[in-house]
């Protein structure tokens, strides 16, 4: 795996290492990678968690309605039929319908085949799945909002981390 393929999300519960699928969703990977590099995700909370489904973050407003991409407000889907939501640890773009990708993303906690063809899959958790699973157990209210805020403390690109060492 190339260093440029990985982003590390250091969260309030621990580190989540993300392998990006550059060959399958290059624009989506570039968006996520660049937003992480620019510090866009630093201090941003996971604003929605649904047990046995997914954890969602990437909205700096924390409302689930905010966030923009590096390409402007929204950009097109990169749906690859060879990639499916087959289990826990799949990284996909959250959206409000076709071609409405911004900065929000989610990580699955279980198979979610009904999302196939509707959300761009652009990576997977390569390390830190225990953190994702623990986060999936956090208590939420009736609107799937967390009682105890869980944040991305900072997001790092593996190549940048290696430069610092």
From Swiss-Prot:
PROSITE patterns xrefs: CSA_PPIASE_1, CSA_PPIASE_2
Reactions catalysed according to its record: [protein]-peptidylproline (omega=180) = [protein]-peptidylproline (omega=0)
Keywords: Isomerase, Rotamase
Keyword presence, Isomerase: yes
GO biological process: protein folding
Annotated EC: 5.2.1.8
Source taxon at top rank: Eukaryota
Keyword Isomerase set for record: yes
Molecular function as annotated in GO: peptidyl-prolyl cis-trans isomerase activity
GO CC, one annotated term: catalytic step 2 spliceosome
Protein family according to the UniProt entry: Belongs to the cyclophilin-type PPIase family. PPIL1 subfamily.
Record protein name field: Peptidyl-prolyl cis-trans isomerase-like 1
